[in-house]
Amino acid sequence: MVITVLGERFFDPMIDVFLDAVEAERPGFDVVQPWRRIGDPAAFRALAEEAGLSGFTLREDTDILTLESPDDWWRIVIGSGLRRTAEALGEETAERVRARCGEAMQALGITQVDLTSQYLLATRP
């Protein structure tokens, strides 16, 4: 059996830009990030052990995604769990968040994001 979860580096460094933009546009807005619960390998290992799995192997990979323009970042937002936040903000606020992200991306010279995935390989008991 294989179980895959997102790792600690979730669209770094743009995730922080996105969260800052959301906070600037809607202070106190709760951005739901369920992947953070088991993002680090120790938490993932503990969850597997709690589920009764043993003799498993954990592996972590990092993919680098190239961003050629701010539109590439927004496609990632809309194609990921961040879409929930963008939709909850409403169209006008989401557009302002999108603009802030694009401006920061260009100002900071961000041309790629990292995405870490963790894999648990186990044999069913």
For each feature predicted by the language model, list its residue ranges.
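Conserved class I S-adenosyl-L-methionine
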Residues: 1-27
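Conserved Class I S-adenosyl-L-methionine
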Residues: 35-125
